[in-house]
Amino acid sequence: MASVRETGVNVSNDGITVVLGSQWGDEGKGKLVDILCDNVDVCARCQGGNNAGHTIVANGVTYDFHILPSGLVNPKCQNLIGSGVVVYLPAFFSELEKLEQKGLKCRDRIFISDRAHLVFDYHQRADALNEAELGKQSIGTTGKGIGPAYSTKATRSGIRVHHLYHWAEFEARYRKNVADLQKRYGAFEYDVEAELIRYKELAQRLKPFVIDAVAFMYEALQSKKRILVEGANALMLDLDFGTYPFVTSSNTTVGGVCTGLGVPPQRIANSIGVVKAYTTRVGAGPFPTEQLNEIGDHLQSVGREVGVTTGRKRRCGWLDLVVVKYSTMINGYTSLNLTKLDILDALDEIKVAVAYIINGKRIETFPADLDSLEEAEIVYETFPGWKVPTTGITHWDQMPENAKKYIEFIEKFVGVPITFIGVGPGRDEMLVKE
């Protein structure tokens, strides 16, 4: 694989490089982050929680990441969990220990913002009770308590990391939140006293990791450190711009980077959108190009489309460029990473959605009104397959002609160059398009 510095999208030392999902998540952001982390000083998470999930294969070892930044794979990289992240401490320590068991030395390279909000078991209980209450109208959350944690944040009853070190306030907030949830959902069994004892211990274990993240990021920028931010989830799961209400509870856009880390927008130098060569989605919600047929089955099985966090099979369908173009409008991508191209290798023909026809009108942007999508006619562009393996390709001139046409069409339609092309699961199976 060509080095990152040969791509034209270097990790700048005069600003922040951001990696964002352009679809419904699971695009393969972690692999690109892992590759780029070879040349960065800081890797940060800005939003979400341990509802995110991705797998990295490095030096023959497989690592699963949920709450921790994937820059931990690079022994020289400092890693930050920013103020916009919601943190479930048992999961934080469990994930840290699993990485250490695989040989990574992490403890002096991972930091948590003192302004980050905490996720508790009562949030997870509320998550499950809310989904059960919704029944068939449930949105299919990960059950990690992320939504309820962001809810208490929005109502100003949330508990932040710094509250752990002011115990009287922590305890008062904790007891009130449990009482409020029991009023809302009815009395449920919950051992508050045992949980308070547990969090007194966790507070002491966490203390070495806690920092002022705003000052950390400011100093990193002033020192011209190379900074990479990995977004969790994806644009179509954004609270404001995604397929609401079938979304996550944080801002997954480039704007979420600024609010989640406390950095000004003008310090973002590069925004890389990660695009899977087809489309997948976990859980309920609109999916215009979903294929409930042999094509969908092929993409699911060959692509091994099973969620890292939930273990659920992902719904699969054709690439939807209406979604990717809409995502580009919001995030202003400077380049794209097309992933899992190899999963299309065996197909006779490949379709790409380029527009929707709704109420007789052709549109090329994603509508806010989800009901209108149910009646939408999807306009496809059809391409002949290339029918040869792309795995093992290391240079653009080795790419099959039909695959080149597919890639070039995406670039032209979206208006953004594709710089990286994934042709296999390994970190070395990433073609750099000059």
UniProtKB/Swiss-Prot annotation:
CDD domains: AdSS. Pfam families: Adenylsucc_synt. This is Adenylosuccinate synthetase. Substrate binds at residues 308-314. Homodimer. Its cofactor is Mg(2+). Binds 1 Mg(2+) ion per subunit.
